[in-house]
From Swiss-Prot:
One of its GO terms (molecular function) is ubiquitin protein ligase activity. This is Ret finger protein-like 4B. It comes from the Eukaryota. One of its GO terms (cellular component) is cytoplasm. Residues 76-263 form the B30.2/SPRY domain. It comes from Homo sapiens (Human). Keywords: Metal-binding, Zinc, Zinc-finger. SUPFAM superfamilies: Concanavalin A-like lectins/glucanases (SSF49899), RING/U-box (SSF57850). A zinc finger (RING-type) spans 11-53. The lineage of its organism: Eukaryota, Metazoa, Chordata, Craniata, Vertebrata. GO terms for biological process: innate immune response; regulation of gene expression.
Length: 263
């Protein structure tokens, strides 16, 4: 499931997620920049599809940018249907995740339904304390496929994903070697693998998390834009893995925004 989703959302030329996708007459889809570069390397403006090797006839260069708008318009409905299909597939694995207050930092407060968390206001020197306030979700998983969504809204700094149980949640070292597989926002969006930057908008508001414990993968989606933004792989599926949520502590005079697990 996870591998197929990634393949559907990736360009066969650059092997990255589609950027301004375009469909050729043979119906294969590529990034616009990738296929334009591929075709323009042939001086008579004829090229074969990189996948099926069918010859693709291309309009004159000055017409290319105009014609691509028409092609993109024709693709819009089918791409939207594909995005909705992927989203519906993910929701077949939807879990009723809530926050486990028994595992929480004392600096967090929760809604009555245990779906929302917020940092308390604090008024002391943060340099003497851990910068993070964390909590686990429930249930935890050791096998199978599981999906949940988190509304991060206006929260300035957050970390989401899974961690093995037990793991040292009081540490600031939230890295895979310590049992954490997460994405985080601290200005830009990053993965916790050597702080690798993720090509996602800093205005990302809702994050979808798909855990395939059998394939040892966790995928992160920009739900509003139906985009896969990152994949962690290679962790041990025999571990008990718990949903993980973390908010940065507040400085003096700051007020915290709410992080919410979507029902």
């Amino acid at each position: 499931m996870a591998k197929r989703l990634q393949a559907e959302l990736s360009c066969p030329v650059c092997l990255d997620f589609f950027s301004c996708s375009i469909s050729l007459s043979c119906t294969h889809v590529f990034c616009f920049d990738c296929i334009q570069r591929y075709i323009l390397e042939n001086h008579d403006f004829r090229a074969m599809c990189p996948l099926c090797r069918d010859v693709v006839k291309v309009p004159a260069l000055e017409e290319w940018q105009v014609s691509v708008l028409t092609l993109m318009t024709k693709q819009h409905n089918s791409r939207l249907e594909q995005s909705l299909h992927v989203r519906e597939e993910l929701r077949h694995f939807r879990e009723d995740v809530t926050l486990d207050a028994a595992t929480a930092s004392s600096l967090l407060v929760f809604s009555n339904d245990l779906r929302s968390a917020q940092c308390k206001k604090i008024h002391h020197d943060l340099t003497k304390d851990p910068r993070l306030a964390c909590v686990l979700g429930t249930p935890c998983f050791s096998s199978g496929q599981h999906y949940w969504e988190v509304e991060v809204g206006e929260v300035k700094s957050w970390s989401l994903g899974v961690c093995k149980e037990p793991a040292d949640r009081k540490s600031n070292d939230l890295f895979p070697e310590h049992g954490f597989w997460i994405s985080m926002k601290a200005g830009a969006i990053h993965a916790n693998t050597h702080l690798e930057r993720i090509p996602a908008s800093p205005r990302l508001r809702r994050v979808g998390i798909f855990l395939d414990a059998d394939l040892e993968e966790i995928q992160f989606f920009d739900v509003d834009n139906n985009v896969l933004i990152y994949t962690h792989d290679g962790f041990f599926s025999l571990e008990l893995l718990c949903p993980f949520f973390c908010l940065e502590l507040l400085g003096e005079g700051e007020s915290g925004n709410v992080l919410t697990i979507c029902p």
